[in-house]
């Protein structure tokens, strides 16, 4: 596809050619349509109409070698134009399906981000077909966000004193028998201990959703009742303990809050996706804990033991890679992860016949993300994406 700059240059050159031929009025009409399409941001129509108009003029030049004929010759292969038409159709379908609305300038900006992400997902999926990676990707409702906008959702904020090598101990590290034989696979969803996947939206409240989900499973094991607990309660009411509302927080801090005050049900303290004044009352608190245990940072065997014997465990992972943002299926494995920045819930583990060991991880980006809201992350791959570096569970 010719760029705006290239088309403009051809227009200027063609102007001289038209002027010599005494066809200045015809060129004005061509450039008028060019201007209109440019202002509307319709690149496909711009290129197509501009070329068609020049072709109409060029056909009457009796085979003369002109700038117009040169332009027409260079643009005979319209494969890139077809690709642009395909992109614009996909983009229109995308924004329509999600009910997104942008003015023309913003629309072009967002479509460029969408295109970049589409190309990235296509590259990964090609590698999957070639057997080079163990997961697939697909565009989702995050496909038109800048990296900065997306990172707002990654709300795990580790305390400054946290040492991912295990030198810090805010609670007692989980103790377990390393020689104990554990089940080959565990999935707490099949035991009725996991509530449906929810969507945190644009608030950096992943820590609140992960903590609430862990407390739901804990309460189910203690009482036999599975309740939907309130992440909003945690977002609003743990700031005095050091969390930062929609700007992020830390799961153990939320567990400490639950042990002191209790957590309300979602129906009594519904999620709104923004920070509000704490509206906690003793009368609506339904679930408490007795503190929490942490996994020795980096110890995946300890994490496996805790998931098998104690229940779902909140984990901090590196979720900033675009490959993770658009994960769809398979066993996610990434060799170049950053520090933990996103809180999720490990609800089980297993082994894929082709791709090896994995963790079953519940996310809070809605069911359209990943495999119905879940990601299967590589296990026993050197603590991949720090999955065992900031893990804890209620007791």
From Swiss-Prot:
InterPro entries in alphabetical order: Papain-like_cys_pep_sf, Pept_asp_AS, Pept_cys_AS, Peptidase_C1A, Peptidase_C1A_C, Peptidase_C1A_papain-like, Prot_inhib_I29
This protein's UniProt keywords: Disulfide bond, Hydrolase, Protease, Signal, Thiol protease, Zymogen
EC number: 3.4.22.15
Keyword Glycoprotein tagged: no
GO molecular function terms noted in the UniProt entry: cysteine-type endopeptidase activity
Pfam families: Inhibitor_I29, Peptidase_C1
Catalytic activity reported: Specificity close to that of papain. As compared to cathepsin B, cathepsin L exhibits higher activity toward protein substrates, but has little activity on Z-Arg-Arg-NHMec, and no peptidyl-dipeptidase activity
Active site: 206, 342, 363
Secretion signal, residue range per the UniProt entry: 1-16
GO biological process: proteolysis
Disulfide cysteine pairs (residue numbers): 203-246, 237-278, 337-385
Record bears the keyword Cell wall biogenesis/degradation: no
Propeptide, residue positions: 17-181
Top enzyme class: hydrolase
Family to which the UniProt record says this protein belongs: Belongs to the peptidase C1 family.
Protein name in the entry: Cathepsin L-like
Organism: Brugia pahangi
